[in-house]
């Protein structure tokens, strides 16, 4: 657990001592920025030599005393530098958790004769999963009390849980280290007893066959952490006797399991950056083997969903923005025989698909704006679902019944809290089942969200979403701005409501979400124009939006802050190398910053899967291009803005040593006196702390960092 409010250096920040001796004693306790030793490590490829003075910081065992001591010294220094904001952090934290409903419950869903729900008990960090038989007078059963399961552990997460078709056994997965490597356990719901079966080293998915005694799981490679082996496990047997059903030998592919909505098939997704396909087997046949629906091909993506003797398929075949087609069992393996259901459009990007008995429902994006449509199988006509706002996000919620007469969706906008609707398939009427309550009162009419387009340096219009409070927004340069973006992997982050942002917005901040190239906000081309040898567009777009905000007096650069995490942390590293003068402060969360070295090392998790995203630096053209923007390699002796960098020791996605090395190099080379803090969570991974409330400790720390630079970290 992070040490935010209990600081070893708290004595430094008491009232000034009255005597010279007392002052001297206090000053002796003041920590200076940790300076790391240098051990030159030579790396040579393509005739180019790089010297990495901090390569020694990598320790895959995470046990080296010197490395751990240096990380702790960084954390101690960060806490010291923020100690004077302790009370303000507490105020922010209490604000944030105060907006959360303490006894919150999820919308129940009916599955196989039971109603399922999760609940938060006041004061608890974790949910309790319960079910009730779908009949009058039935008593509630506790499936998993995650609070009890997490007792005594610094980190705990349930990855997945699933119940057998006979409703008697629950399988669930748990991670106690934050490396996203899960152990699957089983519990008899009739007796409450745990079964002896345990399956270690998995990606966490629990997929049952229909016989209620066998299940499928995905084993991870212990070094690369890639899921690559699919096994069938039979209850009552040891993991060592499990049957290997599939092994992925191409380490550029991700592998995932799923079960179709009609429960007829167990499937495998085979996914790389440029390919997607599926294998399936009959969930009713214990001897069944997986077979490909269609051969895997480079640059071909397809997902197949059964509908009786046919399949509905979302594909990019002859459709950059995707189309929906159908095929029979006989024609499924021949893409040239697939028949159009929803044709390709240059203007509309199809993002999601749900095949129900009565309607085919799909989500799409037109000029960056989300919508949802329902298609009638008989007529072939589709009708768009109407929502009140123009700037929103809609996606499928948990839909478990193929025969359902309604589709359950989640809806959110920058000013509307997350809401769950059931939409009637017959007349498209909407029933609001729940909207997340903002405790303490929230009036959406006091806030404005809008979408503007910003012209990039190469003439492209960049969508930008903006949120502010009406009575504090001036557009005269006096409002502070937090600008966020991600822009990688084709991941499209739509505008959303986050109650913690109110702690910024209500104090005058403007929140700006730049939908830069590298996502699929404006279709597949928007992604292609922000990857591989076009990656610089991602960074340029962010900087161009920043310059627009300054030019149009949304903000003065003395009040402009930037935030990005993971691949968005790479973005932060690139923009401060390109335009450090633009930003008062930058938050780089778990940042991917040592791009070239990581992508040259195939033993590091995720490397081989991402050659089609960044390029393979073993090819000179990619090496040269990646080197030109790699934040770690491009650190120079110059002024940088104030920086807050974060990591988790057990991060499985971006290893701790990347930001650790980056901070050390920045400390050594930067010429300014601006703040550089490295906030280290010694007990967490890529997603930060586990638990409902703990995450807000870090959020309060981050927000206090910005307010402190504005000299507003006081109440």
Give the ranges of each region predicted by the language model.
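Hydrophobic beta-strand positions that form the internal "hydrophobic ladder"
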Residues: 115, 170, 215, 266, ...
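Non-catalytic accessory segments flanking enzyme active sites
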Residues: 65-162, 173, 253-306, 351-352, ...
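Bacterial signal peptide processing site
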Residues: 18-20
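Cap/lid segment of the alpha/beta-hydrolase catalytic domain
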Residues: 147-161, 172-179, 193-195, 423-429, ...
